A protein has these predicted regions:
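Non-catalytic ligand/cofactor/substrate-binding and regulatory segments of enzyme domains
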Residues: 2-126, 138, 158-195
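Surface-exposed patches in mature extracellular/periplasmic domains of secreted proteins
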Residues: 119-128, 141-153
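PAPS/PAP-binding and catalytic site of the sulfotransferase fold
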Residues: 131-136
Length: 195
């Protein structure tokens, strides 16, 4: 359903070029009695340009993708890359996630890098949802901008903002992402999930 009675909009998204996505998971399918999962929101970048592109010091070859967001991981409140695909593949997590995607120009990679430089950690008031929606809006422009109500940004509010668009994808495939790493204070560290 379209927000506020307006017709739902379709974002241009060809299966070529650079594809930016914002994905949100409300946590409901992973919540249990007395244990609420609040969900997660992240950004994805899919390279289908025919050549390698670079995001910070990461080469993203044609046909590969990268995901990124800030996390509230104990001792590591920095910017983590490709953690979400590992959770999806190894643990079956984030089922029911919703994604919105659009094409961007390669010049927009600089906008993403600048945003990452200025906003490289999770905080209570600037959580993963806040971080992701503000990055998305900085890159895509007014026509594709997501609008939320209130001051606190949550996956649920991002899902509500998605209702303005008719091109929302369920359980987007992130299997072409690479290994997990993080940036904290400008330094890159390779990571692995515990088995």
């Amino acid at each position: 359903s379209a927000a506020a009675g307006k017709a739902a909009r379709t974002l241009p998204c060809e299966e070529e070029g650079l594809i930016l996505s914002i994905t949100t998971f409300d946590g409901k399918s992973e919540s249990k009695p007395f244990l609420k999962c609040f969900g997660h929101t992240w950004i994805g970048l899919d390279n289908r340009t025919g050549h390698t592109v670079y995001l910070k010091d990461r080469a993203i070859p044609d046909g590969e993708m990268v995901t990124f967001s800030v996390w509230a991981v104990s001792g590591l409140s920095g910017l983590l890359f490709d953690l979400e695909p590992c959770y999806i593949v190894n643990y079956g997590r984030h089922t029911g996630r919703l994604s919105l995607s659009t094409n961007i120009g390669e010049e927009q990679l600089k906008v993403i890098e600048d945003y990452m430089e200025q906003h490289d950690k999770w905080t209570v008031d600037k959580n993963c949802s806040y971080w992701s929606i503000h990055l998305w809006n900085a890159v895509v422009g007014e026509d594709a901008a997501l609008k939320i109500r209130g001051f606190v940004c949550t996956p649920e509010k991002i899902e509500q903002a998605f209702s303005a668009f008719d091109c929302v994808e369920v359980d987007k495939d992130f299997s072409r992402a690479g290994d997990i790493y993080c940036y904290k204070d400008g330094e890159r560290t390779e990571l692995q999930l515990c088995s």
